[in-house]
Each structure stands twice: as C-alpha cells, then as structure tokens.
Amino acid sequence: MTASRRTLMVMAGGTGGHVFPGLAVAHRMEAAGWRVVWLGNPAGMEATLVPKHGIPMEYVRFGGLRGKGLKTKLTLPFNLLRACWQSLGALRRVRPDVVLGMGGYITFPAGVMAALSGRPLVLHEQNSIAGLANKVLAKFAKRVLVAFPGALPHAEWTGNPIRAELARTETPQARYASRSGPLNLLVVGGSLGAAALNEVVPRALALLAPGERPRVVHQAGAKHIDALKANYEAAGFAGGDAVRLVPFIDDMASAYAAADLVICRSGAMTVSEIAAVGVAALFVPFPYAVDDHQTTNAAFLADAGAAVLVQQRDLSAELLADWLRSQSRASLADMAERSRSLAKPEATDEVARICATVAGANLEEIK
C-alpha cells in the first residue's frame, strides 16, 4: 500500500487547543500524500473550521458532563451508546490506517470504538494535566504522546504540534540584540478577551514614568475592544504610536517575534507557541480552567526561569508596574533563550512520523 492510499482519521473537537494542533498534523500528513478525514461534533467549532481547510468530516454527537444539569447526566448512557454507534459507522466508512486522538469529549466514544474495531490508536494530550478521556483511552492506545512531561504515565514527550511559521522565527539572541529603545510589549487576551489583563495593564502602564513605558500592542477580542479603549483612556492614554489596540492578530508568529515580552493567559498552545518562538512571557493563568491546568502549563516554563507566573488573584497594577521597572531587554532576552531551549519545534513532524509508524508505513514517507 502506498502512502497516497493511506488514511489518517483525526479525532478532535470543542476548543482551538484541540483543533489547531490536529490541523497542523493533518496538513503535514496530507503533504506526505496521506488522505485525512476528521471526526468531530457537528455542534463544535471544528464543524466550521475544519472544512475550510479542505478536510472532509464525519460527525458524532457527544458532549461533556462538567457543569451540565441532571437531565444531561441521566441521558449519558443513551448519548454515549449513540456516539459509539456513530463512531463505529464512521470508522467502517473511512477505514483509517491509524486514528489520532487530539482531545475533546468526542475522542472518548470514537477512541473506544477504534480500539475495539482493531484500528490502531495514537493519543496526544496537549495540556500538562490530562483530560478524563485521554486518561481512560491511554490504556488502549498504541502510542501515547504528551506536550508536557509527566502529563500521562509512560507517555512520549513530543511537544504540541504548532504552525510551521512559528518554528521558523529567528533566534531570540538575534532578535533581541537588534533592538534598541523602549521595550516591545504584547498583551494577548485571546478571542474571548481577558478582563483581568484588560483592566490591570493600562493602570500599570500609567504608573510608569513616560521614559519607562514600553511600546504596546494589546489584543482584546472584538467584543472587548471598546471596553479596552475606555480603560486606556481612563488611564490617561489618548492613543498614538506607543499604544496599539487590536481586536485580533492574524499573524501571531510575527507578533510574538516582534515582542520583547508577552503578557497572556497560559493555555497549552499559547505556552507551546511562546516557547517555539522564544520570547519572554508573564503568564496569568485563567483561574477557572478545568483542573487548574493553565497554572501547571505555565509552571513548565516558569520553574525553569523561562517565564514568570502570576496568579490572577495576586495581579495588581502596582505589582505589574514594579516588575516592569525591574526588567531590561537583556533580562528578557535571557528568559527568551531559556524558553526556546525547552521548545519542541519538530512536534508536528514527530507526531506525524509516529502516526505513520503505527500504521506500518516507512518513516521516509513523512519527510
């Protein structure tokens, strides 16, 4: 069987943290001549996003239990049985050579049926604390891969698959050494915005003397951009070249590479991307993340002196202003170098190679 006739089924859904690394691997496999089919939830973000990438989909209806009411919990056995039956149908139609589970509730019924039907299963856990589905499915998988060491027992540390352009940036040493003048600060609130960052950062910058202030790019999400502008105006910033407020950033690789410091949440993909680029970061974990996984994600870099971790409850304008005063481009460059040293920039290729191996393909098919 040639590589062009081999098929990978990717199971992932629910959030971008599962879908985007799955897409990175999917495109890598397609580039090697593989057929890729995606298994997802018709109500999930993957149903809109994945077809835009030209990848055909199979659908299974299944959702999570966390925070759901009694009715959802009582109907779980029926919903799980239906999802298993739908998954089996998809597996029979697609007949994949290997199934890659990238996380999300959808992976549980599909992963179980893949194992029971004899389809080799590869799992990848993006977070530093494994989700329930992957904890169970790890017992049935041929290979278990993790983005952070220790997330699952007996797993292989591959890192998180990321977009290729993030791994192609100049070294931190070259970037930081070429700069002069005020520091370049990137604040990333994400598509949903991060109210704590949007409120504290403008007030912290106002506490700095004009000569101490960095140049700022602050991304806040389309729904929060007006409130962010009001926060900066209330802090005494009338706009101008030194502060740029944007609802979204299309080219995150360039934005990270242009920054001396990033202030952001610590989702798994954010941490992995920052390490891949090699940029200093101050992480403020989302305090309501499942199992507080954002704290342990950030700790992976912070414990190595490659980032700073501040809990949201401890974040204040005064604390942030004092910390910014204590930093120099040289100190941030050192942090960025440490971050880059912990990155796994070849994660996409490595996960692709492992999938090929499990399917019985030659490694040369993934170049």
Curated annotation (Swiss-Prot):
UDP-N-acetyl-alpha-D-glucosamine binds at T15, G16, G17, N127, R163, S191, I249, Q294. Cell wall formation. Catalyzes the transfer of a GlcNAc subunit on undecaprenyl-pyrophosphoryl-MurNAc-pentapeptide (lipid intermediate I) to form undecaprenyl-pyrophosphoryl-MurNAc-(pentapeptide)GlcNAc (lipid intermediate II). It is a peripheral membrane protein. It catalyses: di-trans,octa-cis-undecaprenyl diphospho-N-acetyl-alpha-D-muramoyl-L-alanyl-D-glutamyl-meso-2,6-diaminopimeloyl-D-alanyl-D-alanine + UDP-N-acetyl-alpha-D-glucosamine = di-trans,octa-cis-undecaprenyl diphospho-[N-acetyl-alpha-D-glucosaminyl-(1->4)]-N-acetyl-alpha-D-muramoyl-L-alanyl-D-glutamyl-meso-2,6-diaminopimeloyl-D-alanyl-D-alanine + UDP + H(+). The gene is murG. Pathway: Cell wall biogenesis; peptidoglycan biosynthesis. It comes from the Bacteria. InterPro entries: GlcNAc_MurG, Glyco_trans_28_C, GlycoTrans_28_N. Gene3D superfamilies: Glycogen Phosphorylase B. GO terms for cellular component: plasma membrane. GO terms for molecular function: UDP-N-acetyl-D-glucosamine:N-acetylmuramoyl-L-alanyl-D-glutamyl-meso-2,6-diaminopimelyl-D-alanyl-D-alanine-diphosphoundecaprenol 4-beta-N-acetylglucosaminlytransferase activity; undecaprenyldiphospho-muramoylpentapeptide beta-N-acetylglucosaminyltransferase activity. Its EC number is 2.4.1.227. One of its GO terms (biological process) is lipid glycosylation. The keyword Transferase applies. Keywords: Cell cycle, Cell division, Cell inner membrane, Cell membrane, Cell shape, Cell wall biogenesis/degradation, Glycosyltransferase, Membrane, Peptidoglycan synthesis, Transferase. It holds the Pfam family Glyco_transf_28. This is UDP-N-acetylglucosamine--N-acetylmuramyl-(pentapeptide) pyrophosphoryl-undecaprenol N-acetylglucosamine transferase.
